[in-house]
Protein backbone atom coordinates (compact mmCIF):
# COMPACT_ATOMS: atom_id res chain seq x y z
CA UNK A 1 0.00 0.00 0.00
CA UNK A 2 1.14 3.54 -0.80
CA UNK A 3 0.80 5.01 2.69
CA UNK A 4 2.85 7.12 5.07
CA UNK A 5 3.19 5.92 8.63
CA UNK A 6 2.59 8.95 10.90
CA UNK A 7 4.74 7.33 13.60
CA UNK A 8 7.77 7.64 11.34
CA UNK A 9 7.06 11.35 10.79
CA UNK A 10 6.56 11.98 14.51
CA UNK A 11 9.81 10.22 15.30
CA UNK A 12 11.73 12.33 12.77
CA UNK A 13 10.03 15.74 13.10
CA UNK A 14 7.84 15.63 16.21
CA UNK A 15 4.06 15.60 16.63
CA UNK A 16 3.73 19.39 16.42
CA UNK A 17 5.32 19.52 12.96
CA UNK A 18 2.95 16.83 11.67
CA UNK A 19 -0.03 18.59 13.24
CA UNK A 20 0.83 21.99 11.76
CA UNK A 21 1.76 20.53 8.38
CA UNK A 22 -1.66 18.88 8.03
CA UNK A 23 -3.33 22.19 8.89
CA UNK A 24 -1.06 24.05 6.48
CA UNK A 25 -1.93 21.84 3.49
CA UNK A 26 -4.99 23.88 2.58
CA UNK A 27 -8.71 24.45 3.31
CA UNK A 28 -10.37 21.61 5.21
CA UNK A 29 -13.06 21.07 2.58
CA UNK A 30 -10.56 20.48 -0.23
CA UNK A 31 -8.54 17.39 -1.07
CA UNK A 32 -4.83 17.99 -0.64
CA UNK A 33 -1.71 16.32 -2.05
CA UNK A 34 0.62 14.78 0.52
CA UNK A 35 4.22 15.82 0.11
CA UNK A 36 6.69 15.09 2.88
CA UNK A 37 9.03 17.81 1.57
CA UNK A 38 6.68 20.35 3.10
CA UNK A 39 7.38 18.94 6.56
CA UNK A 40 10.87 20.41 6.60
CA UNK A 41 9.42 23.88 5.93
CA UNK A 42 7.10 23.65 8.93
CA UNK A 43 9.95 22.27 11.05
CA UNK A 44 12.08 25.24 10.00
CA UNK A 45 9.33 27.66 11.00
CA UNK A 46 9.03 26.09 14.46
CA UNK A 47 12.78 26.35 14.98
CA UNK A 48 12.63 30.03 14.00
CA UNK A 49 9.73 30.64 16.39
CA UNK A 50 11.72 28.92 19.16
CA UNK A 51 14.73 31.15 18.46
CA UNK A 52 12.67 34.27 19.21
CA UNK A 53 12.91 33.19 22.85
CA UNK A 54 16.54 32.09 22.74
CA UNK A 55 19.46 34.42 22.14
CA UNK A 56 23.15 34.26 22.99
CA UNK A 57 23.00 30.52 23.51
CA UNK A 58 20.15 30.39 26.03
CA UNK A 59 16.62 31.42 26.96
CA UNK A 60 16.45 35.20 26.78
CA UNK A 61 13.16 37.08 27.13
CA UNK A 62 13.10 40.73 28.18
CA UNK A 63 10.53 42.45 30.41
CA UNK A 64 11.34 45.80 28.79
CA UNK A 65 8.57 47.56 26.82
CA UNK A 66 8.31 46.35 23.24
CA UNK A 67 8.83 48.49 20.16
CA UNK A 68 5.55 49.69 18.62
CA UNK A 69 6.29 47.90 15.34
CA UNK A 70 6.72 44.59 17.19
CA UNK A 71 3.40 45.14 18.97
CA UNK A 72 1.74 45.94 15.66
CA UNK A 73 3.13 42.74 14.14
CA UNK A 74 1.97 40.63 17.09
CA UNK A 75 -1.54 42.08 17.22
CA UNK A 76 -1.93 41.83 13.44
CA UNK A 77 -1.15 38.13 13.80
CA UNK A 78 -3.53 37.72 16.76
CA UNK A 79 -6.36 39.37 14.81
CA UNK A 80 -5.75 37.25 11.71
CA UNK A 81 -5.50 33.94 13.58
CA UNK A 82 -8.69 34.56 15.55
CA UNK A 83 -10.57 35.39 12.35
CA UNK A 84 -9.18 32.33 10.59
CA UNK A 85 -10.09 29.99 13.44
CA UNK A 86 -13.70 31.17 13.19
CA UNK A 87 -13.63 30.26 9.48
CA UNK A 88 -11.65 27.00 9.98
CA UNK A 89 -8.96 28.50 7.73
CA UNK A 90 -6.09 26.97 9.65
CA UNK A 91 -3.70 27.10 6.69
CA UNK A 92 -3.83 30.89 6.54
CA UNK A 93 -3.46 31.05 10.33
CA UNK A 94 -0.13 29.28 10.00
CA UNK A 95 0.87 31.65 7.21
CA UNK A 96 0.16 34.53 9.61
CA UNK A 97 2.41 32.92 12.23
CA UNK A 98 5.20 32.58 9.67
CA UNK A 99 4.91 36.22 8.57
CA UNK A 100 4.91 37.47 12.16
CA UNK A 101 7.88 35.29 13.10
CA UNK A 102 9.91 36.59 10.17
CA UNK A 103 9.10 40.21 11.02
CA UNK A 104 9.86 39.77 14.73
CA UNK A 105 13.14 38.05 13.87
CA UNK A 106 14.15 41.03 11.72
CA UNK A 107 13.21 43.37 14.57
CA UNK A 108 15.23 41.22 17.02
CA UNK A 109 12.19 41.13 19.29
CA UNK A 110 12.44 39.22 22.57
CA UNK A 111 9.95 41.18 24.70
CA UNK A 112 7.58 39.27 26.96
CA UNK A 113 4.57 41.47 26.14
CA UNK A 114 4.92 40.34 22.51
CA UNK A 115 6.06 36.73 22.89
CA UNK A 116 3.86 35.50 25.73
CA UNK A 117 0.57 36.18 23.87
CA UNK A 118 2.00 34.43 20.81
CA UNK A 119 2.71 31.32 22.88
CA UNK A 120 -0.95 31.26 23.91
CA UNK A 121 -1.97 31.94 20.32
CA UNK A 122 0.05 29.07 18.85
CA UNK A 123 -0.91 26.52 21.52
CA UNK A 124 -3.79 24.89 19.55
CA UNK A 125 -1.49 24.53 16.54
CA UNK A 126 1.72 23.37 18.26
CA UNK A 127 0.74 22.34 21.82
CA UNK A 128 4.03 20.70 22.81
CA UNK A 129 6.10 23.65 21.63
CA UNK A 130 3.76 26.05 23.42
CA UNK A 131 3.84 24.14 26.71
CA UNK A 132 7.64 24.08 26.70
CA UNK A 133 7.89 27.82 26.08
CA UNK A 134 5.11 28.54 28.58
CA UNK A 135 7.10 26.78 31.30
CA UNK A 136 10.30 28.59 30.31
CA UNK A 137 8.44 31.90 30.59
CA UNK A 138 7.72 31.01 34.22
CA UNK A 139 3.96 30.90 33.75
CA UNK A 140 1.77 28.84 36.09
CA UNK A 141 -0.19 25.78 35.03
CA UNK A 142 -0.83 24.72 31.45
CA UNK A 143 -0.95 27.16 28.56
CA UNK A 144 -4.23 25.52 27.52
CA UNK A 145 -5.86 26.89 30.69
CA UNK A 146 -4.80 30.46 29.96
CA UNK A 147 -7.02 33.02 28.27
CA UNK A 148 -6.72 32.97 24.48
CA UNK A 149 -5.38 36.35 23.29
CA UNK A 150 -7.43 38.95 21.44
CA UNK A 151 -5.98 41.84 19.49
CA UNK A 152 -5.79 45.44 20.65
CA UNK A 153 -6.99 47.64 17.79
CA UNK A 154 -4.97 50.62 19.03
CA UNK A 155 -1.76 48.86 17.96
CA UNK A 156 -3.09 48.46 14.42
CA UNK A 157 -3.95 52.10 13.80
CA UNK A 158 -1.40 53.80 11.58
CA UNK A 159 -0.07 56.85 13.42
CA UNK A 160 3.08 57.45 11.40
CA UNK A 161 4.33 57.26 7.83
CA UNK A 162 7.73 56.08 6.66
CA UNK A 163 8.34 58.65 3.92
CA UNK A 164 10.74 57.90 1.07
CA UNK A 165 12.84 61.05 0.73
CA UNK A 166 13.96 61.57 -2.87
CA UNK A 167 16.48 63.92 -4.44
CA UNK A 168 15.82 64.64 -8.11
CA UNK A 169 13.47 61.65 -8.17
CA UNK A 170 15.87 59.13 -6.61
CA UNK A 171 15.05 57.75 -3.15
CA UNK A 172 17.99 58.30 -0.80
CA UNK A 173 16.60 57.53 2.66
CA UNK A 174 13.45 56.91 4.70
CA UNK A 175 12.09 59.30 7.32
CA UNK A 176 9.35 58.31 9.76
CA UNK A 177 6.98 61.18 10.59
CA UNK A 178 3.53 61.47 12.22
CA UNK A 179 0.69 60.98 9.73
CA UNK A 180 -1.07 64.11 10.95
CA UNK A 181 1.98 66.33 10.39
CA UNK A 182 1.27 69.28 8.08
CA UNK A 183 3.19 70.15 4.93
CA UNK A 184 5.26 72.96 6.46
CA UNK A 185 6.28 70.82 9.44
CA UNK A 186 7.24 67.98 7.10
CA UNK A 187 9.43 70.34 5.08
CA UNK A 188 11.14 71.56 8.26
CA UNK A 189 11.70 68.01 9.56
CA UNK A 190 13.27 66.98 6.26
CA UNK A 191 15.54 70.01 6.06
CA UNK A 192 16.62 69.55 9.70
CA UNK A 193 17.70 65.94 9.03
CA UNK A 194 21.48 65.63 8.71
CA UNK A 195 21.06 63.20 5.81
CA UNK A 196 19.35 65.93 3.79
CA UNK A 197 22.28 68.26 4.33
CA UNK A 198 24.66 65.52 3.24
CA UNK A 199 22.78 64.83 0.00
CA UNK A 200 22.37 68.51 -0.88
CA UNK A 201 26.03 69.29 -0.33
CA UNK A 202 27.02 72.49 -2.13
CA UNK A 203 23.98 72.42 -4.41
CA UNK A 204 20.90 74.61 -4.09
CA UNK A 205 17.36 73.48 -3.34
CA UNK A 206 15.31 74.48 -6.37
CA UNK A 207 12.02 73.04 -5.19
CA UNK A 208 10.56 70.74 -2.55
CA UNK A 209 7.53 68.63 -3.42
CA UNK A 210 5.63 67.32 -0.40
CA UNK A 211 2.42 65.32 -0.59
CA UNK A 212 1.44 64.55 3.04
CA UNK A 213 1.03 60.83 3.60
CA UNK A 214 2.72 59.96 0.30
CA UNK A 215 5.99 61.45 -0.99
CA UNK A 216 8.80 63.91 -0.40
CA UNK A 217 10.97 64.96 -3.34
CA UNK A 218 13.68 67.62 -3.26
CA UNK A 219 14.84 69.11 -6.55
CA UNK A 220 18.46 70.27 -6.32
CA UNK A 221 20.90 71.66 -8.83
Mark where each language-model region is:
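Short coil/turn linker and secondary-structure boundary residues
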Residues: 1-4, 13, 181
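Helix-rich, typically C-terminal accessory recognition domains appended to large enzymatic cores
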Residues: 6-176, 209-215
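A short, contiguous, amphipathic alpha-helix enriched in charged residues
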Residues: 180-200
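Cysteine/selenocysteine-centered motifs that mediate thiol-based redox chemistry or coordinate metal-sulfur cofactors
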Residues: 198-221
Amino acid sequence: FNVTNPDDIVEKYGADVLRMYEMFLGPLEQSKPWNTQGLSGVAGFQRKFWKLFHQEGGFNVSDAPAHKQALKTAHTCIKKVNEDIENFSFNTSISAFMIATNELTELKTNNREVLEPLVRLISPFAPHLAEELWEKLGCKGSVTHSKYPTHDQSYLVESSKNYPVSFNGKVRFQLELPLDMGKEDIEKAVMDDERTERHIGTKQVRKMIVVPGRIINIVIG
